[in-house]
Regions:
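A common structural junction motif
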Residues: 61, 138-145
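Intrinsically disordered, low-complexity linker/assembly segments
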Residues: 86-120, 124-126, 131-139
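Short, conserved, surface-exposed binding loops centered on an aromatic residue
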Residues: 16-18, 66-69, 93
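Catalytic/RNA-binding core of pseudouridine synthases
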Residues: 10-20, 24-38, 46-49, 88, ...
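Helical lid/core segments from catalytic subdomains that handle acyl or acyl-like groups
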Residues: 28-85
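A generic structural signal for well-ordered coil/turn residues at beta-strand boundaries
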Residues: 5, 22, 71-73, 95-97, ...
Length: 145
């Protein structure tokens, strides 16, 4: 089963959209010192997703050209690794209406390492139960790494 089995319908303003595929938007530093963006297709196989992620992020970092998928529903992400953070709030502007996942640095403790994340979603797209199911599945996958 896919990590996002329940997110095929998304509401935007007064319209409801159905998408056949989903992608994760990733932001990467590029060789010019700026930021570039790519959309990595969601798939059931974590190794395939990772290979696609590595290829796309290396490409956009080197070429400074965004690689975006206009036909997929996009889940935004952001790795703010230059700092520690607990949350990012109010990301709802024109381009951030879909679910949004962000994180900062790992926090290394004496007995464990943690990575706090911030997950936002709009209730027109999913309910709290769906968000909790997503986070539980994400934690399950992280526990296998």
């Amino acid at each position: 089963s896919t990590l996002f089995p329940y997110t095929t319908l998304f509401r935007s303003r007064d319209k409801l959209y159905r998408y056949d595929r989903m992608a994760i938007n990733v932001i990467a530093d590029n060789v010019k010192g700026g930021l570039s963006f790519c959309d990595v297709a969601v798939c059931d196989d974590l190794e395939t997703f990772n290979a696609n992620y590595m290829h796309l992020t290396e490409t956009i970092s080197r070429t400074c050209q965004d690689i975006l998928d206009d036909e997929a529903v996009i889940v935004g992400t952001s790795a703010v690794t230059g700092t520690e953070l607990d949350s990012i709030t109010n990301q709802y502007s024109g381009i951030f209406n879909n679910p949004f996942l962000a994180w900062g640095r790992y926090r290394k403790g004496w007995l464990k390492t943690t990575l706090p994340i911030s997950f936002q979603f709009h209730h027109a797209q999913m309910d709290g139960k769906h968000a909790a199911r997503f986070l539980e599945e994400l934690q399950r996958i992280v526990n296998t790494i």
